[in-house]
């Protein structure tokens, strides 16, 4: 996947997000870039990376896997780990360039809050990796991509500001970063004294997301392995 368009997005997506934030908000580029990142750009990026990681095997009838002297479980876990590294890497790149620009524009988000926020985004998006991989193995690239991106766009803000936000895992990322980015999930600045500035939701949100990661990885492998055995 090193030379694919999806891999290039790991580097270009943060740059495009920063440019978009600057065009739309000028000196308030930080807030705009972070908001566009977790509401649209990052969901699309994670979905494309995850789907691209598995689509080649599906298109070749799983022969790429069957020919390897390695267990399918190790291949599945290895793909997930590779995507985890890419997800953290692209989030840290966004933080780096956004923070650098912040020194020349309005520093609306401090470097430390920006770093914590980007790490939280990575952690709370990880569970979608095995889910999209599984969907791709079952449905193909474009159906899985459309379903994943559509779910993010529709569900990421539903209930994000409610006490029951944890029931909607797609809303967890936009909720847990509120106190660090200082804005509502819709991008509007938080009012002083807003309950969304309370960081109590962070740990439960991360724990739920990581639990889903483990669950999706296990369920995904079981169903993926059944698909591999059909071609054996």
Identify the function of each model-found stretch:
Residues 9-10, 139-159:
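Pore- or pathway-lining transmembrane helices of multi-pass membrane proteins that form conduits
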Residues 113-143, 211-219:
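Hydrophobic alpha-helical transmembrane segments of polytopic membrane proteins
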Residues 65-72:
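Short helix-to-coil transition segments within interhelical loops
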